[in-house]
């Protein structure tokens, strides 16, 4: 199960931190490491800091974009230490672990995303995350080393996984009582939906592309905190398609007859 959690490091500048993150992952039973445009990898410092977790480094995927790194994920959790203009669902590490387990029990793929050592994740990158995770360190000295942050979250995930052995999760209970298809949408499917939604809002005159303000960011937050199933996504996409037909004066399926 833990092999469906990917640790995503974005634009890491120090290769030693990649090695330290790999060691933290292997300590806690995780194996998927994805690197988005690392400044220097592979590198001897990464191997040295991995301290025996070189199999994690050897299997690491290097990609050009965060979108590639998140492809196929049903939930994306991004670490953030800064206040943002638009509030977002914020979890502590323990809540993050619980959320991970619920999606794993639903056969989803999970991504834990960590930003640059000097600046973290950008606002645009954080908007690709359904949840933001904050490690409540001492505010007088709150900056954590990247590998240490990976260790904190992967430890909590492992503890939640151990505690859940033999016990039904909230997601399992939901599945046992629901008639709906509960296979969750992936991060890339959500991105396609957001693009479709934006085009539709422009078509009906609700969104001015010249003055978008924060509308799409707020809508991302709204949908991001919901566990949307593939069936529900099909319904939402169908509604948008029919709305676009009406806006463009085309024939559409529904009628009042």
Curated annotation (Swiss-Prot):
Compartments where located: Cytoplasm
Q: Which residues form a coiled coil?
A: none
Asked if the keyword Methyltransferase belongs to this entry, the reply reads yes
**Under which EC number(s) is this enzyme classified?**
2.1.1.-, 2.1.1.200
Which top-rank group of organisms is this from? Bacteria
InterPro entries in the record: Alpha/beta_knot_MTases, RNA_MeTrfase_TrmJ/LasT, SpoU_MeTrfase, tRNA_m1G_MTases_N
Q: Where is S-adenosyl-L-methionine bound in this sequence?
A: 79-82, 115-117, 135, 142-144
Provide the alphabetized UniProt keywords. Cytoplasm, Methyltransferase, S-adenosyl-L-methionine, Transferase, tRNA processing
Q: Catalysed reaction per UniProt?
A: cytidine(32) in tRNA + S-adenosyl-L-methionine = 2'-O-methylcytidine(32) in tRNA + S-adenosyl-L-homocysteine + H(+); uridine(32) in tRNA + S-adenosyl-L-methionine = 2'-O-methyluridine(32) in tRNA + S-adenosyl-L-homocysteine + H(+); adenosine(32) in tRNA + S-adenosyl-L-methionine = 2'-O-methyladenosine(32) in tRNA + S-adenosyl-L-homocysteine + H(+)
* Effect of disrupting the coding gene: Inactivation of the gene abolishes Cm, Um and Am formation in tRNA. Mutant has increased sensitivity to hydrogen peroxide (H(2)O(2)), with reduced expression of oxyR-recG, katB-ankB, and katE.
MF terms from GO for this chain are: RNA binding; tRNA (cytidine(32)/uridine(32)-2'-O)-methyltransferase activity
Q: Name one GO biological process term.
A: tRNA nucleoside ribose methylation
Transferase as UniProt keyword: yes
Among the entry's GO cellular component annotations, what is one?
A: cytosol
Say which enzyme class the record assigns. transferase
Q: What does this protein do?
A: Catalyzes the formation of 2'O-methylated cytidine (Cm32), 2'O-methylated uridine (Um32) or 2'O-methylated adenosine (Am32) at position 32 in tRNA. Confers resistance to oxidative stress.
The text of the family note is: Belongs to the class IV-like SAM-binding methyltransferase superfamily. RNA methyltransferase TrmH family.
Summarize subunit and interaction data from the UniProt record for this chain.
Answer: Homodimer.
**Which NCBIfam families did the record assign?**
PRK15114.1 (NF011694), rRNA_methyl_1 (TIGR00050)
Official protein name in the record: tRNA (cytidine/uridine/adenosine-2'-O-)-methyltransferase TrmJ
**Organism of provenance:** Pseudomonas aeruginosa (strain UCBPP-PA14)
The major lineage groups are:
Bacteria, Pseudomonadati, Pseudomonadota, Gammaproteobacteria, Pseudomonadales
């Amino acid at each position: 199960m833990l092999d469906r959690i990917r640790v995503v490091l974005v634009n890491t500048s120090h290769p030693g931190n990649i090695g330290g993150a790999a060691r933290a992952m292997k300590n806690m039973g995780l194996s998927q490491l994805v690197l988005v445009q690392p400044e220097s990898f592979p590198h001897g410092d990464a191997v040295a800091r991995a301290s025996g977790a070189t199999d994690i480094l050897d299997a690491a995927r290097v990609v050009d974009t965060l979108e590639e790194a998140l492809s196929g994920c049903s939930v994306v959790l991004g670490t953030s230490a800064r206040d943002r203009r638009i509030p977002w669902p914020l979890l502590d590490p323990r809540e993050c672990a619980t959320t991970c387990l619920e999606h794993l029990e639903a056969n989803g793929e999970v991504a834990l995303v960590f930003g640059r050592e000097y600046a973290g994740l950008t606002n645009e990158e954080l908007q690709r995350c359904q949840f933001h995770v904050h490690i409540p360190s001492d505010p007088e000295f709150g900056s954590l080393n990247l590998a240490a942050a990976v260790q904190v979250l992967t430890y909590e995930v492992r503890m939640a996984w151990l505690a859940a052995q033999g016990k039904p999760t909230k997601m399992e209970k939901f599945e046992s009582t629901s008639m709906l298809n509960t296979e969750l949408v992936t991060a890339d499917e959500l991105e396609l939906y957001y693009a479709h939604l934006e085009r539709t809002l422009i078509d009906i005159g609700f969104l001015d592309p010249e003055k978008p303000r924060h509308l799409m960011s707020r809508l991302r937050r709204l949908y991001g905190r919901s566990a949307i199933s593939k069936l529900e996504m099909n319904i939402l996409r169908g509604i948008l398609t029919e709305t676009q037909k009406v806006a463009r004066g085309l024939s559409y399926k529904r009628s009042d007859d």
